[in-house]
């Protein structure tokens, strides 16, 4: 029997002008617009039948500040499905405090790329199942990469970026995903800066490149505009889970109708 695919709503959280946590959505990691309250959205998705929930503090790493753990704790109080929290996690103590605040898993991007040993430290202390390595990938059409795919008739590779997509690293996503898995990551969270917020569909070449080369479970993220896009990333790239934000936040589709649509298309989901 095929493994059940997971449907995961995600909130991108930042501090507003009053220093309060708020949810935002944007396009290509830019042009952010206020979307809602993180605690209210957590409660909504918990009751709606989501399989998991992701909370990303989208400026903690770039601003060099700590993750907003008070908000994480408030979200965890309303969330009785697995909760993954990312943003600003740089040390083993950061992992511990985030889990203590109520997270079931932590998502690490910048901190792991800057110090890869953090992956093994976290996996050894808390278990691989708690360690999700996030990659914010950007397409590069040059000869600096290692793993190339064809996109619209051109050869490209995918570069890992850090600090919310603000800085390139020169590191190939597929190479890094393999290293992260070898170091103890229990899951990979693959974001596409090029697809983010477009609602044109997931970056299939990116997701497939990671899934084909790394045995660790992969969460596909960025670009979802419909349940059909989720079906594509499950069938064409073999992702284990699909993450979406805007289509759920703005109630273009509910979790329930998304799952029913996938079920009708033969995708195994938890109804």
UniProtKB/Swiss-Prot annotation:
EC number: 4.3.2.10
Keyword Amino-acid biosynthesis in record: yes
GO terms for MF: imidazoleglycerol-phosphate synthase activity; lyase activity
Pathway: Amino-acid biosynthesis; L-histidine biosynthesis; L-histidine from 5-phospho-alpha-D-ribose 1-diphosphate: step 5/9
GO BP annotations listed: L-histidine biosynthetic process
Gene Ontology cellular component list: cytoplasm
Location in or out of the cell: Cytoplasm
Keyword Oxidoreductase in annotation: no
Keyword annotations of the record: Amino-acid biosynthesis, Cytoplasm, Histidine biosynthesis, Lyase
Entries under Pfam families matching the protein: His_biosynth
Residues forming the catalytic site: 12, 136
Catalytic activity: 5-[(5-phospho-1-deoxy-D-ribulos-1-ylimino)methylamino]-1-(5-phospho-beta-D-ribosyl)imidazole-4-carboxamide + L-glutamine = D-erythro-1-(imidazol-4-yl)glycerol 3-phosphate + 5-amino-1-(5-phospho-beta-D-ribosyl)imidazole-4-carboxamide + L-glutamate + H(+)
Membrane spanning stretches: none
Subunit structure: Heterodimer of HisH and HisF.
PANTHER family found in the cross-reference section: IMIDAZOLE GLYCEROL PHOSPHATE SYNTHASE HISHF, IMIDAZOLE GLYCEROL PHOSPHATE SYNTHASE SUBUNIT HISF/H IGP SYNTHASE SUBUNIT HISF/H
Function: IGPS catalyzes the conversion of PRFAR and glutamine to IGP, AICAR and glutamate. The HisF subunit catalyzes the cyclization activity that produces IGP and AICAR from PRFAR using the ammonia provided by the HisH subunit.
Similarity field: Belongs to the HisA/HisF family.
UniProt name for this protein: Imidazole glycerol phosphate synthase subunit HisF
UniProt source species: Natronomonas pharaonis (strain ATCC 35678 / DSM 2160 / CIP 103997 / JCM 8858 / NBRC 14720 / NCIMB 2260 / Gabara) (Halobacterium pharaonis)
Gene from which this protein is expressed: hisF
């Amino acid at each position: 029997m095929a493994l059940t695919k997971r449907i995961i709503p995600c909130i991108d959280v930042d501090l507003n002008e009053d220093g309060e946590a708020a949810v935002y959505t944007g396009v290509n990691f830019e042009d952010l617009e206020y979307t809602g309250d993180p605690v209210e959205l957590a409660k909504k998705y918990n009751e709606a039948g989501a399989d998991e929930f992701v909370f990303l503090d989208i400026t903690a790493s770039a601003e060099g500040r700590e993750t907003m753990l008070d908000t994480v704790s408030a979200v965890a109080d309303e969330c009785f499905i697995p909760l993954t929290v990312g943003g600003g996690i740089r040390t083993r103590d950061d992992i511990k405090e985030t889990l203590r605040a109520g997270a079931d898993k932590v998502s690490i991007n910048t901190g792991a790329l800057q110090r890869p040993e953090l992956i093994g430290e976290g996996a050894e202390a808390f278990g691989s199942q708690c360690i999700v390595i996030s990659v914010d990938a950007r397409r590069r059409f040059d000869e600096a990469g290692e793993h190339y795919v064809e996109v619209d008739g051109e050869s490209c590779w995918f570069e890992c970026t850090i600090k919310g997509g603000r800085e390139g690293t020169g590191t190939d996503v597929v190479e890094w995903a393999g290293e992260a898995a070898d170091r103890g990551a229990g899951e990979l969270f693959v974001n596409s800066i090029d697809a983010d917020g477009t609602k044109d569909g997931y970056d299939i070449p990116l997701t497939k490149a990671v899934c084909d080369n790394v045995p660790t479970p992969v969460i596909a993220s960025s670009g979802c505009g419909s349940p059909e896009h989720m079906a594509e990333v499950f069938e064409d790239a073999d992702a284990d889970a699909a993450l979406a934000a805007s289509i759920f936040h703005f109630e273009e589709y509910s979790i329930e109708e998304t799952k029913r649509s996938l079920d009708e298309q033969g995708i195994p989901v938890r109804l």
